[in-house]
C-alpha cells in the first residue's frame, strides 16, 4: 500500500499545522515498514537546505520505505491551480501512483485514490470575525468541497468533530478522532538547564507566557488588558508578560493595546521561538496563559502542561477537553475573569505543576501514529 501525504505545511511552517504534520508522520512511518509513503510538498521558492527539509531527508534516510517528492511549484500556485481554478490534474500526475491520499491541512488535492482529509478547526465558520476575510472566503469554498470528496475526515478533538457535523453536515460515520501528542522533550526541566536560556533570550525573572500567532482569535488584546488589571495598584510588581509568536493578521492592535495601557516596560514580545528553546521557555514561565476564543485542539496548552507550567486557558471549544482538571479555565470574553484566573494559577502553583504532566501523558504521538495506521488500513479495505 502506497500512502501519499501532503507534506507542504511541514516543509514550510515552523509551528501549527507544520509541526503537527512533522510530529505525526515522524511517529507513524517507522511503525509498519510494509507501508510505503510518498511525502510530497510544494517546493517552488523554498530554500533548498531549509531546516525542515534536512529533517525530512533524515527521516527518509532512516526509513527506506519513505521517499520525499518535491513538486517544483509554489504553494500559492498549487492552490490557484487545484482550488481556485479547480483544474482536474490529479496529484498522481505529479507524484506517481498512490493508494491513499492523506491531506493534513484542510484541503484535498484532486486524486484518484481514497482520501483522508484533516480538518483541524472551523474558525472560519464558528468565529468568522477572527479570520482574515480573504482566507475565510477561500476556506468557505475549499473545505466543504474537499469534505465532499474525502472518504474519511480526521479531527483533533471531539469539539471539532461536533462542529464538522453540525456546521457542514458530515455524518459521524465518516469522522475519525485522532488526538495530537506531545514530544517528550516537553517535560519539567531542572533550573540549571533553563537559566542560560533566560539570559540568552533576555527573559525577566518572573513572567506570564503566551505562545502562538499574534492574531485576533488568540484574544491577546483582552489578555493584555487583564494583565493591566492584575498588576494595577502595584500588585505583582515584578511580574511581566511575554508574548512569543509570529505576527499574524491585525497584529498591530496588540502592540497598540500595550502602548495604550502604558505597559511597554512590562510586556515583552519575542518573535518565533525555535523548537529547541520552547521547553526551556515554558519551564521558566510562572504561568502559561492562553485565552483563545476558539481552538481545534491547542497544542501550546498541551506543551505547557507537559512542562509542569501552571496553565490558564479558555473554557470553550476543545480546550477543556485537553486540560481536564489540570488547568484554570476562564471565560475568554471576561477580562476580569482572565485576571482572576491568572491570580488563582499563581496561587495554586504547586498543585498545577504536579497536575499538568499527568494530564499531558494522556496524549502521545505514538498513540496517534497507531491510530493513524488503523485508519489507513480501514481506507485500504474494500469499499462497502
Question: What are the functions of these language-model segments?
Answer:
Residues 1-384:
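Carbohydrate transferase catalytic cores enriched for Leloir-type hexosyltransferases
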Amino acid at each position: 500500500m502506497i500512502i501519499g501525504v501532503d507534506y507542504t505545511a511541514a516543509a514550510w511552517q515552523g509551528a501549527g499545522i507544520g509541526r503537527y504534520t512533522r510530529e505525526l508522520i515522524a511517529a507513524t512511518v517507522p511503525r509498519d515498514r510494509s507501508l510505503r509513503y510518498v511525502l510530497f510538498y510544494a517546493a517552488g521558492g523554498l530554500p533548498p537546505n531549509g531546516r525542515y527539509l534536512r529533517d525530512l531527508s533524515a527521516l527518509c534516510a532512516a526509513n527506506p520505505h519513505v521517499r520525499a517528492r518535491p513538486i517544483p511549484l509554489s504553494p500559492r500556485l498549487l492552490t490557484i491551480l487545484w482550488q481556485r481554478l479547480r483544474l482536474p490534474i490529479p496529484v498522481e500526475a505529479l507524484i506517481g501512483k498512490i493508494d491513499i491520499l492523506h491531506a493534513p491541512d484542510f484541503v484535498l488535492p484532486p486524486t484518484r485514490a481514497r482520501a483522508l482529509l484533516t480538518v483541524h478547526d472551523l474558525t472560519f465558520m464558528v468565529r468568522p470575525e477572527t479570520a482574515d476575510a480573504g482566507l475565510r472566503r477561500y476556506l468557505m469554498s475549499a473545505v466543504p468541497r474537499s469534505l465532499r470528496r474525502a472518504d474519511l475526515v480526521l479531527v483533533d478533538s471531539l469539539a471539532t468533530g461536533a462542529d464538522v457535523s453540525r456546521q457542514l453536515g458530515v455524518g459521524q460515520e465518516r469522522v475519525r478522532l485522532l488526538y495530537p501528542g506531545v514530544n517528550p522533550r516537553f517535560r519539567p526541566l531542572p533550573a540549571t538547564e533553563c537559566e542560560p536560556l533566560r539570559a540568552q533570550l533576555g527573559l525577566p525573572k518572573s513572567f506570564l507566557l503566551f505562545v502562538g500567532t499574534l492574531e485576533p482569535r488568540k484574544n491577546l488584546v483582552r489578555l493584555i488588558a487583564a494583565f493591566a488589571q492584575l498588576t494595577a495598584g502595584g500588585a505583582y510588581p515584578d511580574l511581566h508578560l511575554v508574548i512569543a509568536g509570529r505576527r499574524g493578521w491585525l497584529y498591530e492592535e496588540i502592540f497598540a493595546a500595550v502602548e495604550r495601557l502604558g505597559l511597554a516596560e512590562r510586556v515583552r514580545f519575542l518573535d518565533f521561538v525555535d523548537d529547541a528553546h520552547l521547553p526551556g521557555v515554558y519551564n521558566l514561565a510562572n504561568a502559561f496563559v492562553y485565552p483563545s476564543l476558539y481552538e481545534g485542539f491547542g497544542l501550546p496548552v498541551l506543551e505547557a502542561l507537559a512542562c509542569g507550567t501552571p496553565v490558564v486557558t479558555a473554557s470553550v471549544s476543545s480546550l477543556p477537553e485537553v486540560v481536564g482538571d489540570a488547568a484554570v479555565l476562564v471565560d475568554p470574553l471576561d477580562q476580569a475573569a482572565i485576571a482572576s484566573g491568572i491570580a488563582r494559577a499563581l496561587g495554586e502553583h504547586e498543585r498545577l505543576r504536579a497536575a499538568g504532566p499527568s494530564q499531558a501523558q494522556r496524549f502521545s504521538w505514538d498513540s496517534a501514529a497507531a491510530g493513524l495506521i488503523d485508519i489507513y488500513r480501514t481506507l485500504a479495505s474494500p469499499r462497502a
